[in-house]
């Protein structure tokens, strides 16, 4: 798979996805929205990794949506009749586009393995949508985020508000949304939005990769269950979640994995765990397998 916006490597059961357009401040061009979900789907469907690290190159993690590129794709016509029909369709087409873009980030939340965001410089506009869909966030000392959409006269629509409002206090979200101000790394850490702040990119990547290795060493089935249940708990009552996790473990708990984890701890060695099964991508003769 050849990508225009990303480099992908897999080592030690860690998939490292790198935004690779530093000269353009890793802006989100149309290819970005196609490539990221395709990469995540491939990794998840084929169980190619136990954890994903998402990072970038250049001065910023991402400068967000490339509005110049998207503006040039608006359909138009010199024919008044055709233009009138296009205008009638425009709202429905815009809605469809927004839903497509939302799924680009929702795939990070929905994939079975944890996604760690390593953020240097700015996470601007759509960058906030991106990092809030990840499981954990880490940032360099010069890092910041900004809900930049308000500065160009629009409401953020690709995931910032439903996710950010669950991660930090609502009043802070509203201040960021209404003013477009920058939230610096230390403020983000103090509010729990980022897990840790590092002096520079190298120190951050070293630490994030170490955390990724720790995750990759655990039982993938248990990690999958933990991510699924934590996400479920965020959107449901305690009573619902307690019942759901009981049903989950009644059907998914594997004694062999527990025994292996205990033996590995006793013997002071890495556990020999099974990987996640591949996702079904089509129906066939092996429906039960």
Model regions and ranges:
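Short loop-to-helix capping motifs
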Residues: 21-22, 218, 255, 268
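Crotonase-fold acyl-CoA enzyme core
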Residues: 106-221, 259-260
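C-terminal long alpha-helix characteristic of the crotonase
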Residues: 138-143, 194-243, 251-256, 273-289
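Short alpha-helical scaffolding segments that buttress acidic/His motifs in well-ordered protein cores
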Residues: 176-180, 226-229, 245, 265
């Amino acid at each position: 798979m050849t990508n225009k916006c990303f480099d992908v490597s897999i080592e030690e059961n860690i998939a490292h996805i790198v935004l690779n357009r530093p000269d353009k401040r890793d802006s989100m061009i149309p290819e970005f929205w196609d490539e990221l979900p395709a990469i995540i789907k491939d990794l998840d469907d084929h169980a190619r990794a136990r954890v994903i690290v998402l990072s970038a190159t250049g001065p910023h993690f991402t400068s967000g949506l490339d509005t110049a590129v998207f503006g040039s794709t608006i359909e138009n016509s010199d024919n008044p009749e055709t233009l009138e029909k296009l205008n009638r369709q425009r709202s429905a087409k815009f809605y469809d586009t927004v839903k497509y873009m939302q799924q680009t980030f929702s795939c990070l939340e929905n994939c079975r393995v944890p996604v760690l965001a390593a953020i240097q410089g700015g996470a601007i506009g759509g960058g906030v949508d991106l990092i809030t869909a990840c499981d954990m966030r880490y940032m360099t000392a010069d890092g910041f985020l900004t809900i930049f959409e308000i500065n160009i006269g629009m409401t953020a629509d690709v995931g910032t508000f439903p996710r950010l409002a669950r991660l930090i206090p609502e009043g802070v979200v509203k201040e960021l949304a209404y003013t477009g101000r920058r939230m610096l790394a230390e403020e983000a850490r103090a509010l729990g939005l980022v897990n840790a702040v590092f002096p520079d990119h190298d120190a951050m990547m070293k630490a994030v990769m170490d955390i990724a290795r720790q995750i990759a060493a655990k039982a993938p089935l248990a990690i999958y269950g933990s991510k699924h249940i934590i996400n479920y708990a965020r959107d449901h009552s305690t009573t619902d979640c307690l019942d759901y996790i009981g049903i989950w473990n009644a059907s998914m708990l594997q004694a062999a994995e527990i025994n292996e984890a205990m033996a590995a701890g006793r013997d002071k060695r890495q556990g020999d765990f099974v990987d996640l099964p591949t996702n079904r991508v089509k129906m066939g003769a092996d429906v039960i397998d």
